Regions:
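Catalytic-core signal marking the mid-to-C-terminal active-site face
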Residues: 1-117
Length: 117
């Protein structure tokens, strides 16, 4: 999350983590749940960041569906915020998507296979 804008009238909160295929209601609910959990646990805020965040060595969100699925399934916060039925439902959807992806033969694999013959 970051504040962006050049004047008090144009300042807004931005979260560029969710993908374009996210359910916006679930994304906002997750952000609120995470914020409330941080407040309840009295977690300290990180210092304000300046510079290019893409070059920062700070914590990262999962970069693959497989690693995101593992984090989602193991998240006590997600289960508390959404309930186990919702977590399990979306986890199953991710597993189905991963199975379809794993079964696909890509152009790279075909090309590489022909190179090796």
């Amino acid at each position: 999350m970051r504040l962006v804008g050049h004047s008090p009238l144009s300042v807004r909160v931005e979260n560029r983590v969710p993908g374009g295929d996210v359910n916006p209601y679930l994304a906002v609910a997750a952000m609120i749940a995470a914020g409330l959990a941080g407040i309840e646990a009295e977690l300290p805020l990180e210092p304000a960041f300046e510079g290019n965040a893409y070059l920062d060595e700070g914590p990262r969100v999962p970069s693959t569906l497989r690693s995101a699925l593992a984090a989602w399934q193991d998240s006590e916060l997600a289960r508390k915020a959404f309930g186990s039925d919702v977590v399990d439902h979306y986890a199953n959807g991710a597993r189905v998507e991963l199975a379809a992806f794993d079964a696909a033969v890509t152009d790279w694999e075909l090309q590489r296979g022909f190179e090796r013959l």
